[in-house]
Amino acid sequence: MYEISADPARLDVARVHRWLSTDAYWALGRSLAKQQAAIAGSLNFGAYATDTGVQVAYARVVTDLATFAWLCDVYVAPEARGHGLGTSLVTAVRDHLAPHGLRRVLLATDDAHGVYAKVGFEPLAEPGKWMVLPLAPVPAGQDRRGRQAEPTASAEPAR
């Protein structure tokens, strides 16, 4: 069993940082200082094993709690996966935000569409209306999503 909480004092920041910086494709290599700043400027949720109190999942929401929210950094520890915890965590986030009257909550995912669909997320109706402003350079060897970049073909013909 798990307990989900938005109490920032319960977060195991070192554990969250380790998960995201070493195992989450979108945050590989993220520094501890960057993670601490992200936590400080966000609404954070943790899932904790009820028998041990150990944190087993995390989610972060960037929001003004008036008009908009961005759900990000959703992570379930490998040993806790496959039991519906991701869906429960995102449901708790949705339920926490619902009373605020936000028009929408956005997220980006490469591989968990099914989890989010169970909670009510759907693809953008008009994705062509959305744009991104990349501000930070892409680290060498990575693409914009933080994944290992595919080798590019050389402009020189092979000899």
PLM ranges: what are they?
Residues 16-49, 96:
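Active-site rim helix/loop that mediates acceptor-substrate recognition in acyltransferases
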Residues 99-105, 109-135:
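Conserved active-site alpha-helix within GNAT-family acetyltransferase domains
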Residues 80-89:
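Conserved acetyl-CoA pyrophosphate-binding loop and the N-cap/start of the following alpha-helix
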Residues 92:
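Active-site signature of alpha/beta-hydrolase-fold catalytic machinery across serine-
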Residues 50-52, 79-80, 134-137:
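Short loop segments at secondary-structure junctions
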Residues 33-51, 56-75:
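A conserved beta-strand-loop-helix scaffold within acyl/acetyltransferase catalytic domains
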Residues 1-30, 142-159:
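Short amphipathic alpha-helix that is part of the acyltransferase structural core
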